Amino acid sequence: MTNHTITTAERELYLALIQRAQYRPIATQWLANLPQWLSDVKDKRRYAHAPAYLSAVENLPQIKVKNVDLNSDILTIDADLTDGQSKQITALMKQLMPWRKGPFQIGSGDNKVFIDTEWHSDWKWNRIKPHLGTLQGRYVLDVGGGSGYHGWRMAGAGAKQVVIIDPSCLFYHQFMAIRHFVAGFDTDMDSDRTGVGYRTHYIPVGLEQLPSSSDQGNQLFDTVFCMGVLYHRQSPFEHLIQLKNQLINGGQLVLETLVIEGDANTVLVPHNRYAKMNNVYFIPSVAALTGWLEKVGFSEVKCVDIDITSIKEQRATDWMSYQSLKDFLDPNDPTKTVEGYPAPMRATLIATK
């Protein structure tokens, strides 16, 4: 017997946007595009694995969840699982591999299912969170949100509504698998609309597909997160402008990206690959990135964290069995990538529109 997790989540997304459209007309454009966005991610002509991913989510068992902790480093869904349920959940969740962003835990005790993801995404969140101020009552957009781990943490931090976007068919279904167990535990208790009142939503699109408005007072978000995306963009300035266009005046951008050491004129443009990735285009210094943000109209730009990625934070696991950071570094000099570039270093900058 299949569950209705995705149907319910999509209905909740529609209801949330309908409510927003009463005060922010731009939301009507989101609503107009939503049927196509949600249809495309299930189209097997676009994504050969889409039917298998959908089946995995729809066949997750119904369990009695006692509590969901969105503030734990391991996003934990507390439930008493039988041995059979544990094995069933494990098998279905493994059909959604590789799991890159997490970690997650379903159940407790001997039968718990622990999804040990490639990234310790909790480490990044713990570095960033002290610098955010409050998310309480804020409307938040998470650009390139992957499996949704950070989006759930934003909801746990008090956001009134979180919209995660990422065009990945796999990541969309990973989010829906976790959503199946979270169910109504992220409900907005102050919501006056019909429906369950989910606070955390997922739209399988890229930033460039989102409607935007230059009209003051017609943007949807108080805070926009963009983490691990900028260096994949061929036009970083266009991307930064698109991020700014989603923010209300006075809104906050949280930008996390690869950086290199250097002055305001230092930008690395990898010749071919960087850490075996062929889609890395620009890696600026913090000073250069600060200048980029100011050039497109952000103010109060500050770097709040710089961290060299370790092989403990990003590594292969049973839930992501492909190559990981260790394989991307020079085996004789871990301060360099296999191509000879500086090893990955990430900075988080916060700016105001």
Curated annotation (Swiss-Prot):
Q: What is its EC number?
A: 2.5.1.-
Q: Molecular function terms in GO for this entry?
A: transferase activity, transferring alkyl or aryl (other than methyl) groups
Q: Which reaction does it catalyse?
A: carboxy-S-adenosyl-L-methionine + 5-hydroxyuridine(34) in tRNA = 5-carboxymethoxyuridine(34) in tRNA + S-adenosyl-L-homocysteine + H(+)
Question: Which Pfam family, just one, is annotated for this protein?
Answer: Methyltransf_9
SUPFAM superfamilies per record: S-adenosyl-L-methionine-dependent methyltransferases (SSF53335)
Task: Report whether tRNA processing shows up as a keyword of the record.
Answer: yes
The UniProt record gives the binding positions of carboxy-S-adenosyl-L-methionine as 101, 119, 124, 144, 166-168, 207-208, 227, 231, 346
- Any stretches that span the bilayer, and where are they? none
GO BP field: tRNA wobble uridine modification
Q: Which UniProt keywords apply?
A: Transferase, tRNA processing
**So which domain of life are we looking at?**
Bacteria
Q: Which InterPro entries match?
A: CmoB, Mo5U34_MeTrfas-like, SAM-dependent_MTases_sf
| Described purpose of this protein according to its UniProt entry | Catalyzes carboxymethyl transfer from carboxy-S-adenosyl-L-methionine (Cx-SAM) to 5-hydroxyuridine (ho5U) to form 5-carboxymethoxyuridine (cmo5U) at position 34 in tRNAs.
What does the similarity note say? Belongs to the class I-like SAM-binding methyltransferase superfamily. CmoB family.
* Subunit text: Homotetramer.
Q: Which HAMAP family match?
A: tRNA_carboxymethyltr_CmoB
Q: What is this protein called?
A: tRNA U34 carboxymethyltransferase
Query: Which organism does this record belong to?
Result: Psychrobacter sp. (strain PRwf-1)
Q: Which gene encodes it?
A: cmoB
